[in-house]
Amino acid sequence: MNDTDKKFPLQPVYDTGFDDGYLQRDYEKCLESAAANDAQTVELQTQLLAEIKNLENEIKALKAQESRQPDPHNNARIQSLEASLNRLVNEYNNFEFQKNYMVDRVAELNNKARFFKDELKRLQQENAAFVNSRYANWADFQSNYQLKLDQFQALIDQQNQTIKQLNEQIAANQGLIDQNVQRLQQNHSLDQQERDALLYEVDHLYNELYELENQKRLVGIEYEATYQDLVSADAELQNVYETIAQNQANFQKQCDAYWAQLKQVEQQIQTTKQELVDEESTLKVRLNDADFYINSRLAELDDLTSKINERDFVSKEQAQDVKASLANLTKEKERLSAEKDSFERLRNTALNDINRMEQENALFAKHLEQQQYEFERKQQESLLKLETEHKQLQKRIGEFKIESEAKSEALLIQERELLEKRREIDDLLTQASLEYEQQRRTNQVLKEKHRQVQQHFQNLVHAKKKLDQKRHYLAEQKRIDEEQIFKLKEKIATERRELEKLYLVKKQKQDQKENDLLIFEKQLRQYQADFENEIEEKQNELFASQKSLQKSFTQLKNKEAELNQKAQKIAEDWAHLKQNKHHHADLEIFLEGEFNHLQQEKHKLLEARTQFDNRVSLLSARFKQKQAELVKQKQSLEQLTAAFNKEQEAVERDWKDRLANLEKQKEMLGDKVHQFDENSLNISKKLAERELAIKFKEKELEAAQKQLSLDNNNNAGLKLQLDKLSESLKTERLELEASKERILDFYDESSRRIADYESDLQARLAEVKTLEKNQQETAAKSERELKVALEKLNQAKKAFLQIRKQQLLEIASVKQQLAQKANLLKNQQAELDKQTEELEAAFLEQDTDKKELEKALHSVKSKQELLERERSFLLQKQREFAEHVAGFKRQVHFKTTQMQRLSEFNKQQQSEQIKRETELKIAFADLKKDYQLFELQKNQEFQQIEQKHKELELLAQKQAELKQELEQKATALASQDQDTVQAKLDLARQQHELELRQNAFNQASLSLNKQREQLTNQVKVLHGELKKRHEKLTLKDRLLAEKEKDQHKKDAEINQRFKQFENEYADFDQAKKRELQELNQIRRNLEQSNASLLKKRNQLTLDFALLRKVQHNTQTNRVQLNTQIKEFLLEKKNFQKASDEAALQKALLIKRLRSFASKLQLQREALAIQKLEFDKRDEQQKSEINNAKLQLEQFKLEKQNFDEAKQKQLIEFKDQCQRLDVEKRLLKQKLVQLKNLSKSYLTYKNRADLSQQQLQHKYANLLELKEKLQTAKRALDKKHRAIYGKMAQFVSELRQEKKQLLSAQKQVDDKSRLLEQNQRHLQNLSSETKKKRQSLEHDINKFDQRRKEAVSSILNSHKKLKQKEGELQGILQKLSLKKTQIEQEFSKLYQQREKLDRQRTTLSKLHRELKAQNEATAHKNREVLEIENYYKKELQRLTTEKSEFDNNKNRLFEYFRKIRNEIEKKEAHIKTVLEETQKKRHLVETEAVKLHLQKQSIISKGQELKEIKERVSRDISHTNKQREELNSLLHQNKLLQKNLAEREREINNKDSLLTQKIQTAKQKLSEKEARILKLLEKMRAVEQQYQAEITRLKTRNADLEKNDNKHLFPPLFKINGNDMNYPYPYPWFYPQQKQEDSSNQIRHLFEQQLQFMQQRYENELTELRRQRALLEKKLDQIQLESQLSAKKNDFEKVEQMMQKLLEKTEQKLSAFDQKINALAEQINTQKAEHADSEKQQLLLRIEQLEKQNLAQAVQTPQPVQPVVQAPAVVPQVIQPQVVQSQPAFLATQQSISKQQQIAQLNAEINSIKKLIAQKAAK
């Protein structure tokens, strides 16, 4: 056992736990052992060099001895030593070559091992960093999540506390209310003041209770917000789970990739093992050669010893020489055995190195598995932690839900109790609300009518949308049909020129439109600026008018104050007069006059107040007019913005149309390139065919020349014809070389173009990256601006809500004050009633004093003054209330303007987003261009690979030619003397080395072919991945488009809600104005009643004065006074009634205001909920947009990685090419060496006969040409099969990808329809909620119950929405799963059997869909099912026939191979037989002269020849039998072809019937579509008339767009039948969309007028859809039939190829039979001609030899020592031609001594005897 044979232990690795230091030490030990092995190999090399030097020295010494003393033994020894030296030199060279190769191989493997170790270290580091980062992020996430949970818990606790406090306060207030109500009901002895006070307290407590309930609702909303935050936290946890799963999947993918690389390294190690085995085989061959050489030398020695023993001519010196030669031979044998041992050591060391590498790889794999196991364990632990935390969260959420439900139930119970108490309170007020109920009923009737009208309007809108959808669907279907039916008919050049001209015209018009748009934008801006200036001026005017009103109001207040002061003075004077009764009555009269004067001034003030009120009403009317004007201006602005948007959309459509044109041009260029590639392939095929024809002609010429050389009696005319043919062939060959040079020039130009394209691609990629960066920056800016705007909006909304709350509280406080003042008035009226009763008692008693009367009058006057003050205070409050309302209006107007600006800002952002989307689409188009260029590059690279393959084939041909030359040299050397045996052996060795090199070269070419196949497979895989990514991007584009549509719909809903809010605000203003008018009327009535009271008071004063004057008169005046008092009391009662009516109206007003406030709060809550929903949707859309961007970036990164991998592969391929070039150079150098060696042997060629050389050369050429033909034919067959197989695979893959794309499109359409249905369902739910709100407004008595129902319905709707969102998420997950399934199916498409199975499954799916769709039309379903069943049967039959055909084909191929192998064997046998016959004939011709006694051997040879003839005849009969079998198989194949043709005819007949049916159906459809188009034209004409009446601008723009469409969109864009060359990548690029958009806008304006016309055409549209569905089904059937026909065409091509191959094989067999017959005829003729001549020549030769022997024996009687040279039996190629009569050795007979001549003759006789004995033994 050597040190290298020891195996390294594996146990310490597991004991130490896979220590890296231990591995390094182990690796160093392995390196040391390898170094020791290298040292041993170096020592072996030195030994070989020493042996070579020793041999050279021996040769020199022997040559020196020969120069001094010539000796024949020395010559033989020198030759043997030279041969051994050459052999050792060759072995040394081979050894160095193998050593270098193994060193390079080991270095490569070491580099790979180092690379993988570095990669492992990097992976470990990345894994550690990844785990640390993920766990760090996870810890942060856990801490953040715990903080959030704590915050949520704290918020929940706070909210619970606040709810408890509010409940306590509500309970306390309710208790107080109940107490006060009980006191009012039970204590009837309470005074009016106490009752009023209790009622006031009850009202105050009721208001507080209302406020507390509002606070409670707000807390509930916050409670829901916290719950939603908890749900979002749960969603974040789920996202974390998903990210962990994704990271785990990515790590698994990386591990799988490295495992695959390790497997590749193991495969490389196995290949090196195989190479070592091959080298061992070569060494064995060499050892066998050496053994053969030694055995041959031993045989020679045995011959010598036998001859010495037989004749006793050998002396002792010769015996010593023989012993010395034997010793040398044994030494050489030992040396060879030592070399064998050294080579075996090398092999063992290499095997040990390989085992060591395998062990290291195994350890490496185990380490990887351990790391993977640890990582998976850590991941599982983290996942378990996350799952436990997730479960805890879910538990907390459940507990929170239970608590929230319990709290909600408690709240509901409390609310029920409150409702019961409120009902009790409301029952007290039901009597006063009868009139209000009547008004409410009338309002309900009106609202129901309004609701019915709205429902009718919504139904009409819904029907209109359905009709629009149907029409859009029909238009799309029509477009698809037109694109599928029509094809491009005009030429490319003319179309391109026309497109360029149209593009210039369109560009000019577009520039004009852009200028017009700029002007229009400037005008809009100016108009907006003017409008804002007008608004500011009007606001200034309003402020000025307010200031003037305030001034007048202050003046009135001052005047009232002065009047009050005067009244006070008069009252003081009156009191002074009462004290001083003795004053004169004149003063009383004076005071009465002043009192009257004051009353007149008071009347004037009242008139001024009425004027002031009139002025206020005028100002309010003007304000209303200005407000209406502003609304009109706003509407005009909206119309202008809509027109601007329309023009912008038209510009975008034009741009999209331009993009579509450019894409179409690109596709046309791609078609041109494809045609160019096909033409180049056809040209190359034609050139190859011409080369083959020329080769065949050359072979025919060579055959003709051979016939000329054989037949000396041919005519000279044939020579001339052959010369002409050779000249024509030369010219054709020159033309071929010129064409080849042109092709090479073309490929050089194409490579240069590829380089230019690559540079352009890189530049474009850089531009795309910059564009993406700019887009990202702009998107970030826009998102920031949006966030800022949304924050401002939220702040403004919050401020608005606060202001609104404050104003509502102020209104409530004003109402309370009014109620207090009303109560005070009631109290004062009660006091007045008491005083009047006292006065009546005083007047009745007649004994009361004047003092009491005067006191009563004084108290009445003071109370009247108090009443006037209170009235003035009330007026002030009313004015303040009006001012508050005006300020509130201003704020609302300001907020509405802000909302309008925000809506405009949103529109601008939407336009910017649309622009960005167009830029993205342009980028996608550029990516498509790049993809096409990549395909072109790929094709060109494949062409380059094919070129290199051809070059390799040329090199192989050159090597074959060199081999032919060497074989020629060998044949020439074989015809030389027997002394050149060693040279022949050297040539045989060189030939063997060349064969080994050729094998290595073939292996290199095979490895290149494998690499080429791998490259093609990789390119196919990448091609599929690019297609998948392209499909994903298209799907994402569609999803983005759908999301944009949803966003537009949401914006429209928001605008509708704002409009509803404005309408509600207007209704609120109207109701408020009505209530203010009612209050003003009440105030006027009160003023009138006050005026009447004042008049009556004046009359009473006058009556009292008269009473003073007429106290002493009779009681007649008293009767009048009593009557007046009674009238006063009646008026007082009427006043009380009026005051009661006012109180009732006040209560009604309070109720109305409360109901309105509750409605406003409900609307506010609904708006808040909707706002939350919209915010969530916006966040979802943002996240989806970010995901799309991330996916785009990933796609770009993957593309970069793909480009880098492609470049690396190209670099590797170039490196391999360089290596091949180096190998070529080495081969050339060795060929040069061989040529130099061959020059040394040229001297021997001159001695050979020219005739034999020519014949041998021609025969060798024939054989080589035959072999070349066979190899070329096999290569061509292989290439054709590979090409056709690849083409068939590519076509089938394309078709299946088309089908799968169509199925995926259908699935996406179905999903989009489901999404639209869900959106409609959501809209229906929103409409139902609106109806419920309206129903809540109808019933005020059942308001609370309905409120609960509304809340429950809203919660249910939210739950449903969440459920639907979950369903949508599930659908999206299903879509993602389906995507993954589709990707997996794409990866499995490369196997043909699975392809056939999938085609069958797709057919079955199509049949099922056809069955599901055609249930409505049963009769047509039956027809379709019959057709489908027929196609199924035919498909099954075709598959069975295909399998039978493939089996027959395989059998034929196997049979052909067997026949070829048998033919080759027979040819080789015939060659050997011919060679043996030729050798025998030559030997008989040379030896028959010497031997008369051995005529029987000649007779035996004749018998052997007869046996050979019989064998040949048997072989010929056997070949005839095989030919008959071949003919029978061909006949069977023809019968199968006939059956296939008959079945194809049947299928074609059925296809024609189907096409006729489809054409009839299409005609009917076209007629119906023409009718509908006429009706649509009529509708469009009507719409255009209305449009002309409404706006002139729209008509101008529409006319311009129509003219542009006529100029810019000729019917060329509608004519396209190919699915692959689809001109419009997106449906909104289609030019017909403009007309549809304009018609949709017109329909929105005139829905009511177009409803009846649309209802007429619904039935016809449904029929069209049904018929179109039938047409689509039939078209699908036609596509299936086209696929079947394509497959049949492929089968026909394969059959044609088979027929061609069979014909070629028949031709070859016939030619081969002809050649065999010709050879047999030649042999028979030669035998017949030379049968007699051979005998005569042999007798003559024997006589001559005997004479020479006798003559020489007489001259030299002593015995002669013959120089024996044993003839080596070497397989020589000897041609069937008669050797000339004069032998070769007679030419040098004079220079040789007589003894030598005798020895030679004896040697020849002995050799002939031996040969005869050997053949007799055989």
Swiss-Prot record:
<keyword id="KW-0843">Virulence</keyword>
<keyword id="KW-0175">Coiled coil</keyword>
<dbReference type="InterPro" id="IPR016430">
    <property type="entry name" value="Cytadherence_Hmw2"/>
</dbReference>
<feature type="coiled-coil region">
    <location>
        <begin position="919"/>
        <end position="1607"/>
    </location>
</feature>
<feature type="coiled-coil region">
    <location>
        <begin position="1786"/>
        <end position="1817"/>
    </location>
</feature>
<keyword id="KW-0597">Phosphoprotein</keyword>
<protein>
    <recommendedName>
        <fullName>Cytadherence high molecular weight protein 2</fullName>
    </recommendedName>
</protein>
<feature type="coiled-coil region">
    <location>
        <begin position="1644"/>
        <end position="1755"/>
    </location>
</feature>
<comment type="function">
    <text>Component of the cytoskeleton-like structure which stabilizes the shape of the wall-less Mycoplasma. This cytoskeleton-like network of accessory proteins containing HMW proteins 1 to 5 allows the proper anchoring of cytadhesin proteins in the mycoplasmal membrane at the attachment organelle.</text>
</comment>
<keyword id="KW-0200">Cytadherence</keyword>
<feature type="coiled-coil region">
    <location>
        <begin position="31"/>
        <end position="880"/>
    </location>
</feature>
<dbReference type="GO" id="GO:0020035">
    <property type="term" value="P:adhesion of symbiont to microvasculature"/>
</dbReference>
